[in-house]
Curated annotation (Swiss-Prot):
Annotated gene: psbN
Gene Ontology process terms (BP): photosynthesis
Family of the protein in this entry: Belongs to the PsbN family.
Taxonomy, superkingdom: Eukaryota
Keyword set, alphabetical order: Chloroplast, Membrane, Plastid, Thylakoid, Transmembrane, Transmembrane helix
Gene Ontology cellular component annotations, sorted alphabetically: chloroplast thylakoid membrane
Taxon lineage: Eukaryota, Viridiplantae, Streptophyta, Embryophyta, Tracheophyta
Name used for this protein in its record: Protein PsbN
Location in the cell: Plastid, Chloroplast thylakoid membrane
Membrane topology classification: Single-pass membrane protein
């Protein structure tokens, strides 16, 4: 394969991995430790 194809595949895999990790952090088990500052704010 050409170098450009390998770089494109690598960047695509990296982007998909980062998106998956962000979704897991937002909605998976680690999200239980996250707090919403807007819920804690008293008007």
């Amino acid at each position: 394969m050409e170098t450009a194809n390998l770089v494109a595949i690598f960047v695509s895999c990296l982007l998909v991995s980062l998106t998956g990790y962000a979704l897991y952090t937002s909605f998976g088990r680690p999200s239980e430790g996250l707090i919403d500052p807007f819920d804690n704010h008293e008007d």
